[in-house]
Amino acid sequence: GNTINIQDSTVTAAISAGVGTSGEANNTVSISGKSVLNNAVIFGGMFHKTGNTLQMHTSGVTAGDIANFENLHFYLPNNIANGDTVLTLDGQAFGTPTDITGANIGVAVTGGKAALQPGDRITLINAELGLTADAKPVNNTSGMKGIQGVSLRYGFDLSTDPNNLYATVNKVETNPQAKTFSEGRAGGLAFINQGADLISEAGIA
């Protein structure tokens, strides 16, 4: 599959990670930084969506529409706040509601601690001409990269209304993987310090 990285960029035309007409696509479009995508339609592939992934590493982005993505992964930055919107779609290119039916949706916070509390709600997608989605979307972070080592882990409930896809924080907990790493690092430092003390006592230092 192909990968397109859009970082701190301005794009006004269509963006397509692939144009194949058969087989699995497995393309990735990654958006980060202060990207301006007004009127741009973002395609995982022109004809197929199998394996295609949209990665959102930022918030406050406006685009024309998205199409042909099997996976929608939202990596919320640590400056995300209650009430923020990640992706706004004006829908003008197609003139129809945005369709994300059947998409695997994953939401996680990356980087440092975010100022989110249980009950806070983030709008992942605001589709101005309407949103067609599964009745009960579920947060599935399988396949999301770079979220295992963060110190806090946020749980999200997903919900929709006729124009929006929401993620509401349902829990905030310490990541046991990050705790294990921290304890291992502290143990290593203690071992180094102990070794230095033994060397000093032996008159070697």
Report residues per predicted region.
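Short loop/turn motifs at secondary-structure junctions
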Residues: T10-V11, A25, V36, T50, ...
